């Protein structure tokens, strides 16, 4: 474990902070982190803020004045990572969602309330989606064998089996409240007592069973009292939410039954199920003022012994022993320093003895450890069942040591320690919020302190990348562990595994793997130019599918193939270098579009024409792999797409000449489209068959050498060099950052002076998705991708149906799958 970066507040007067209040923290599958702080202003009023940041740009924190009247006690992300629940000590629950799908713009439109009753536990209802990781099958060829869907029922279903959305919360007075979000937007809320005899609930946690039930664990805070468990069933009867509860077996902590320890740990300070969908295992922590003890318990079915008298009366009873559920302790720690925070892994690894042995044999450790933070400032990763220490992180010297002795607080514990922690979704990173509001990001090695061969470490990272590819989770935390020397191997292995999948699955994952390769290639100076190629291929695939979708069959009773499919088939069959001869074989009536639509598409068509020209001009320099676009010169599939688009553009140009790409030629009589199509076809013929690519002949190379003297080659605006952190982080050299202040980061591998990547200050900007020029200092509000840096305008300047269809693709996410964030006008 080592520190990746630390982010502090610009001005944080100690008199304005309320250290006695609890902090909450949550980490989404999209690598957004939400956390709370509580500040006093000059009037001594409390402002309960929720801070949301993207792990790649932590200084760009978005702070929301939550509107909660009391301290926020819980934060919880949904499965998609796009909505956030917050609950406070007054019983108010709010549901936050992105405004305009921007990661730094949030609004709350719905919520619920149990007035005056503090919320101690909060969770979204389970949607029935659960994946299992099969570590022992990491070498299998099919993703379906490595990651399988587990049969798991949603907490509540709508008509047709669709899971119903909503949340469940437990209050300090022993109430359970459930709110259901109907498709109409209406919220159904119901509240019920956990049991007939209500009692104080100081700590609680929520888990789900495969049968669709909910399990609540509750404790009153005293280690002398039992930890109680309840089964909660939610249903909708006559358009009203109904809650049924049932008492389950309870337990007493082991330390309370030991005469030597009975009074040493008077309070239960932490109560957690080991996983949201694992209600059979629970973690408990009992503490005194200075020390703690942690126990892990498991719920098991055991046979109930039957007295011989009853066996003689009824032999049937003796044949089939009755079974009961009973809590059994799995492990316990020795006395520890006082535990200040606990973080549990989210990686869905099974914890049966067989699976643990497999994990040990394969040396796959991510997801096996949970994190304990102590008041001495240290963090221990311990095995989630045996509780044995696997890795330790020691923070730097506490701040109080830097102060004069007279000013130091009279306390036995140091000033700085984590009050809230969360593990990432692959368990390779840990975020901690300390008692001064400072955010620390820690790398957690995949080996967790065990010696691992480099080849095996690479295999584990590949396995987790595949997991993110299948689930759609963001993989930023995996990139923290990728060294420049690993990039080439990871990209090649990832491509090999991808090509082994069925064609249908390949099509589903086609954009995700390109985005993954692009983010990997940013980490090495040898592969940084390929980042441009991968993003360009994403853009080309999007343009191709959009333009083909505009084509309509002339008659309704058409054969099975769409006009787009016929276009691809004819272009692949006819290898003629004359664009007009290829065009003759197509039914041109299928390409007829409205004139306004054609004109609105001109910028996209211009990009296609410019890119073809750029590629052909690059052909004589193909020996330079650092030049953007290099990989396209051997990519028969992409060249085939460009060839199809050139044919479509040619046909549309006959309908409306002003929609054609504009070329600046040295001769007025030159047919630029025909010239480029002829050269493009020759290049495509050389590499259209995979594995049998031939070198372009000298005649083609000579003609491409002459292109700059025949046509003016435009400057292509590649994606901007990323301003994110991950490509700039150095091992053992944590970055010191400040919230709200853009840092001066050390040079990254992607800032090398490569052709097409250099940018001078004040250089004109471009809308990367609409291909519109924004000027050197844009006046329109823009948004940028958190992952690749792609910039586009927030509001559309064009209302044409075809353009709207194109822009609808990028409403929620960038073409690489990254989230959007609003950028200031000065940064656009």
Curated annotation (Swiss-Prot):
A single BP term in Gene Ontology: positive regulation of transcription initiation by RNA polymerase II
InterPro entries: MED16_bridge, Mediator_Med16, Mediator_Med16_C, Mediator_Med16_N, Quinoprot_gluc/sorb_DH_b-prop, WD40/YVTN_repeat-like_dom_sf, WD40_repeat_dom_sf, WD40_rpt
Record flagged with keyword Transcription regulation: yes
Location in the cell: Nucleus
Keywords tagged on the record: Activator, Nucleus, Repeat, Transcription, Transcription regulation, WD repeat
Sequence ranges of the WD repeats: 67-106, 198-240, 263-307, 621-662, 777-816
Molecular function GO labels: nuclear thyroid hormone receptor binding; transcription coactivator activity
Gene Ontology cellular-component terms listed: core mediator complex; mediator complex; nucleoplasm; nucleus
Pfam family, one: Med16_bridge
Nucleus keyword on record: yes
Protein family (similarity comment): Belongs to the Mediator complex subunit 16 family.
Assembly and binders: Component of the Mediator complex, which is composed of MED1, MED4, MED6, MED7, MED8, MED9, MED10, MED11, MED12, MED13, MED13L, MED14, MED15, MED16, MED17, MED18, MED19, MED20, MED21, MED22, MED23, MED24, MED25, MED26, MED27, MED29, MED30, MED31, CCNC, CDK8 and CDC2L6/CDK11. The MED12, MED13, CCNC and CDK8 subunits form a distinct module termed the CDK8 module. Mediator containing the CDK8 module is less active than Mediator lacking this module in supporting transcriptional activation.
Role description: Component of the Mediator complex, a coactivator involved in the regulated transcription of nearly all RNA polymerase II-dependent genes. Mediator functions as a bridge to convey information from gene-specific regulatory proteins to the basal RNA polymerase II transcription machinery. Mediator is recruited to promoters by direct interactions with regulatory proteins and serves as a scaffold for the assembly of a functional preinitiation complex with RNA polymerase II and the general transcription factors.
Name by which UniProt lists this protein: Mediator of RNA polymerase II transcription subunit 16
Native organism: Mus musculus
Upper lineage: Eukaryota, Metazoa, Chordata, Craniata, Vertebrata
Gene that encodes it: Med16
């Amino acid at each position: 474990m080592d520190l990746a970066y630390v982010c502090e507040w610009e001005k944080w007067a100690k008199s304005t902070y309320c250290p006695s209040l609890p902090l909450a923290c949550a980490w989404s599958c999209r690598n957004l982190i939400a956390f709370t702080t509580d500040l006093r202003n000059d009037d001594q009023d409390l402002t309960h803020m929720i801070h949301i940041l993207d792990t790649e740009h932590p200084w760009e924190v978005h702070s929301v004045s939550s509107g909660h009247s009391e301290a926020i006690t819980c934060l919880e992300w949904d499965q998609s990572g796009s909505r956030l629940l917050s609950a406070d000590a007054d019983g108010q629950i709010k549901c936050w969602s992105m405004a305009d799908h921007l990661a730094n713009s949030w609004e709350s439109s719905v919520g619920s309330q149990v007035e005056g009753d503090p919320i101690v536990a909060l969770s979204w209802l389970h949607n029935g989606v659960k994946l299992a990781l099969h570590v022992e099958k990491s070498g299998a060829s099919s993703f379906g064998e490595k990651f399988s869907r587990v049969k798991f029922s949603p907490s509540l279903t709508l008509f047709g089996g669709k899971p119903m959305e909503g949340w469940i919360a437990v209050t300090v007075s022993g109430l359970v409240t459930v709110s259901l979000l109907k498709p109409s937007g209406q919220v159904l809320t119901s509240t019920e007592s956990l049991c007939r005899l209500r009692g104080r609930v100081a700590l609680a946690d929520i888990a789900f069973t495969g049968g669709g039930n909910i399990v609540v664990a509750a404790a009153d805070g005293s280690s002398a009292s039992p930890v109680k468990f309840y089964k909660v069933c939610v249903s909708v009867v006559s358009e009203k939410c109904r809650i049924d509860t049932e008492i389950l077996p309870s337990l007493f902590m082991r330390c309370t039954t030991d005469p030597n320890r009975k009074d040493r740990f008077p309070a239960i300070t932490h109560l957690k199920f080991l996983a949201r969908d694992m209600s059979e295992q629970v973690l408990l922590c009992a503490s005194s003022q200075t020390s703690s003890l942690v126990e892990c318990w498991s719920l098991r079915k055991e046979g109930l012994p039957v007295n011989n008298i009853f066996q003689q009366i009824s032999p049937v009873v003796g044949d089939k022993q009755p079974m009961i559920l009973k809590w059994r302790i799995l492990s316990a720690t020795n006395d520890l320093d006082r535990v200040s925070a606990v973080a549990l892994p989210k990686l869905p690894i099974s914890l049966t003895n067989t699976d643990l042995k497999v994990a040990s044999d394969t040396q796959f450790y991510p997801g096996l450890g949970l994190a304990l933070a102590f008041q001495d400032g240290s963090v221990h990763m311990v095995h989630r069942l045996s509780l044995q220490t696997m890795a330790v992180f020691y923070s730097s010297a506490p701040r109080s040591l830097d102060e004069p002795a007279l000013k130091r607080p009279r306390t036995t514990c140091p000033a700085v320690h984590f009050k809230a922690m969360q593990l990432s979704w692959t368990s390779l990173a840990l975020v901690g919020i300390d008692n001064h509001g400072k955010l620390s990001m820690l790398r957690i090695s995949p080996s967790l302190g065990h010696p691992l061969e480099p080849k095996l470490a690479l295999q584990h990272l590949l396995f987790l990348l595949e997991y993110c590819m299948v689930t759609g989770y963001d993989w930023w935390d995996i990139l923290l562990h990728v060294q420049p020397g690993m990039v080439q191997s990871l990209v090649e292995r990832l491509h090999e595994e991808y090509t082994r999948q069925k064609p249908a699955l390949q099509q589903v994952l086609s954009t995700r793997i390109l985005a993954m390769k692009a983010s990997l290639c940013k980490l090495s100076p040898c592969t940084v130019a390929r980042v441009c190629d991968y993003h360009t291929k994403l853009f080309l695939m999007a343009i191709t599918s959009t333009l083909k979708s505009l084509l309509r069959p002339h008659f309704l009773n058409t054969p099975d193939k769409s006009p787009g499919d016929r276009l691809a088939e004819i272009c692949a069959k006819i290898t003629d270098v004359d664009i007009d001869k290829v065009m003759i074989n197509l039914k041109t009536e299928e390409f007829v579009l409205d004139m306004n639509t054609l004109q609105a598409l001109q910028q996209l068509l211009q990009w296609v024409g410019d890119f073809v020209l750029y590629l052909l001009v690059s052909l004589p320099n193909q020996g330079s792999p650092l030049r953007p676009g290099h990989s396209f010169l051997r990519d028969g599939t992409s060249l085939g797409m460009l060839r199809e688009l050139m044919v479509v553009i040619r046909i549309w140009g006959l309908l409306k000449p002003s929609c054609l790409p504009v070329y600046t030629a040295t001769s007025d009589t030159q047919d630029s489209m025909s010239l480029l199509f002829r050269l493009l076809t020759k290049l495509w013929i050389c590499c259209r068959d995979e594995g049998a690519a031939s070198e372009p002949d000298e005649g083609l190379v000579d003609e491409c050498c002459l292109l700059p003297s025949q046509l003016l080659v435009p400057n292509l605006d590649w994606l901007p060099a990323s301003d994110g952190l991950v490509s700039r982080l150095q091992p053992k050299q944590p970055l010191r950052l400040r919230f709200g202040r853009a840092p001066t980061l050390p040079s990254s591998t992607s800032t090398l002076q490569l052709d097409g990547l250099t940018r001078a200050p004040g250089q004109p900007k471009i809308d990367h998705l609409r291909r519109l020029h924004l000027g050197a200092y844009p006046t329109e509000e823009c948004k940028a991708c958190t992952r690749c840096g792609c910039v586009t305008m927030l509001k559309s300047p064009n209302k044409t149906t075809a353009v709207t269809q194109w822009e609808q693709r990028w409403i929620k996410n960038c073409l690489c799958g990254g989230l959007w964030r609003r950028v200031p006008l000065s940064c656009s």
